[in-house]
UniProtKB/Swiss-Prot annotation:
Subunit and interaction comment: Homodimer or homotetramer.
Annotated spermidine binding sites: 264, 288
GO molecular function per UniProt: spermidine synthase activity; thermospermine synthase activity
InterPro entries referenced in this protein's UniProt entry, alphabetically: PABS, PABS_CS, SAM-dependent_MTases_sf, Spermi_synthase
CC annotations in GO: plasma membrane
Major localization listed first in the record, in broad terms: membrane
Amino acids binding S-methyl-5'-thioadenosine: 234, 308, 342-343
Catalytic activity, as annotated: S-adenosyl 3-(methylsulfanyl)propylamine + putrescine = S-methyl-5'-thioadenosine + spermidine + H(+)
Pathway annotation: Amine and polyamine biosynthesis; spermidine biosynthesis; spermidine from putrescine: step 1/1
Gene: speE1
Superkingdom, taxonomy of origin: Bacteria
Localization of this protein: Cell membrane
Protein's recorded name: Polyamine aminopropyltransferase 1
Enzyme class: transferase
Amino acid sequence: MQTALYISVLIISSCGLVYELLAGTIASYLLGETVTQFSLIIGTYLFSMGVGSWLSKYLEKDLIPKFLEIELAIGLVGGFSSAILYLSFGQIRYFQIPLFLLVILIGILVGLEIPVLLRILKKELQFKELVSRVLSLDYVGALLASILFPIFFAPKLGLMRTGFIFGILNVGVALWGTWVLPLRQSKIIILRAQSVVVLTLLILGFSYSDLITYYSEESLYTDEIILSKQTQYQRIIVTRWKNEIRLFLNGHLQFSSRDEYRYHETLVHPALLAHPAPKKVLVLGGGDGLAVREILKHKNVESVTLVDLDSAITNLFSEHGILKELNEESLKNSKVTVINTDAFLWLEESDQTFDVVLIDFPDPSNFSLGKLYTTAFFHTLKRRMNETSVLEIQSTSPLFARSSYWCIERTIASLGFYTLPLHVYVPSFGEWGFVLAGQRPIQFKKKFPKDLKFLNIQELESIQTFPQDMSRVPVEINRLDNQALVRYYDREWNRILD
């Protein structure tokens, strides 16, 4: 019996942590503010476990069958938790209600497990030996789950299937327990029947995960979903309405094929026109290849290095028929080198210098993204530039996130760069901002590449003029130790979305 229960501890501790990680990950995907969501969920989950541990004192008789019933309950609720959360988001206005109800319920049930197990085993071992073995196995199981969840389960199976898999493991513990633990025959029959029912539901859920995911995402997106993919880093959704293609990462619109040319022409061409003879170009982010498409319109460019964290994005936009058509197969051009790694780390390790650096990172909605807009990042980037090099970075909306925009501009200027703020109206986004910078005052060449749809000499002048409601405001410099930009961004966009 001891061995069976020790193995159970290892499994159930892994399951308990995975349910917590699932809730935190889904909340951060759907609601943003990763640090806030994980902090609230972890705190609520741990508190609920404490409540469960306290409630365990009221379980006095038939502890073994009660332990197995707890496992069935956790398997059912935890296994379906991802599906419930995805389906709730599109249907319930206050998504936080089902989110925290599930976290509390799972936390209470998980909190019951270890105290009940300790009481079952108390006659088998000395107390100090019992506690050390059970708790050490509990922590080992949590470690295994924390390693395997981001490396294997989430990217390979997706969040919904991962939930069902660990629910099946919980039920497997209960079903296995009916054979290896001492139980009355009447209890064995009941528990096995319950286990089979719950197991069947979870297997059906696993089998129909794609359908559940499709239905839940269809309720979130008005257009037809033509591609849905979970990677190690993000959820990728591509939608289509007539001839319009849209890319969403973690629920956030990245571009619409109807008007992305306005964004990408403004991101790319001012920087290339500000350099006397750009030959080596570095693109950080921009794995969709749309910025690279614009760069290749400058025939004097000899090489383009694209550094993007997620290989799934660059692979999709290299291989998928519709997507590679959008970027005109730019990622397969012989001038282009694609590197899939962390941009910050790559800059620190590289010894190359570039004439033009274009930065197309996601908005600074969390601290891991916010670090890419800090003085530390731009200081590292500066070492990859020479005296004539220029950089341009997308800088969120100067209208909707005014402080965020000027925080990025001031942070770059604080390192000795001459800056030129730019903005453009993109119908899909509204007003959008960029910052062009160099170690010399910015001067533009007059010769534009052919085939531009938006940018010309007149527009280049107009995008430098900011109306009063987008003009400069006092802001802090964004540093690693203050992450002021993330605070500005959260406050401003939450105000708009609310």
